[in-house]
């Protein structure tokens, strides 16, 4: 199975900060990767598909990039509403696998 190693598991940042989180695939050369945001009690929301494509309606402060088997989600200017858990999903190889998640908190 392809393991998705996500880091950090949690982070705290201030409003306006640039925030990054990463997922590294344990193997595979043509990984198709999505990034999701999940808030407590809510269904996951798709942010980025195909590693770097912004889903319709998602603010442009979110962006995704890829370098080999390393994938990065960046939030360019942190807002209060961004407090959530973020996770990646690879859906190129069965079984599809998720990263462990990054819990993002706002530093007060």
From Swiss-Prot:
Residues 24-34 are annotated as: Complementarity-determining-1. Residues 89-97 are annotated as: Complementarity-determining-3. CDD domains: IgV_L_kappa. SMART domains: IG, IGv. GO terms for biological process: adaptive immune response; immune response. InterPro entries: Ig-like_dom (IPR007110), Ig-like_dom_sf (IPR036179), Ig-like_fold (IPR013783), Ig_sub (IPR003599), Ig_V-set (IPR013106), IgV_Light_Chain (IPR050150). GO terms for cellular component: immunoglobulin complex. Coiled coil: none annotated. Residues 1-23 are annotated as: Framework-1. Residues 35-49 are annotated as: Framework-2. It comes from the Eukaryota. Disulfide bonds join 23-88. The keyword Disulfide bond applies. Residues 57-88 are annotated as: Framework-3. Keywords: Adaptive immunity, Disulfide bond, Immunity, Immunoglobulin. Residues 50-56 are annotated as: Complementarity-determining-2. Residues 98-108 are annotated as: Framework-4. This chain was isolated from myeloma proteins that bind beta(2-1)-fructofuranosyl moieties (inulin). This is Ig kappa chain V-V region J606. It comes from Mus musculus. The lineage of its organism: Eukaryota, Metazoa, Chordata, Craniata, Vertebrata.
């Amino acid at each position: 199975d392809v393991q998705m190693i996500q880091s950090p598991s949690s982070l705290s940042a201030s409003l306006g900060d640039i925030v990054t989180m990463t997922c590294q695939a344990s193997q595979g050369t043509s990984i198709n990767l999505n990034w999701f945001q999940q808030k407590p009690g809510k269904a996951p929301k798709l942010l980025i598909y195909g590693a770097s494509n912004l889903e319709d309606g998602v603010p442009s402060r979110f962006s995704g990039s890829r370098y080999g088997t390393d994938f990065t989600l960046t939030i360019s200017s942190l807002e209060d509403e961004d407090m959530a858990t973020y996770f990646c999903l690879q859906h190129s190889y069965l079984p599809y696998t998720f990263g462990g998640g990054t819990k993002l908190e706002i530093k007060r």
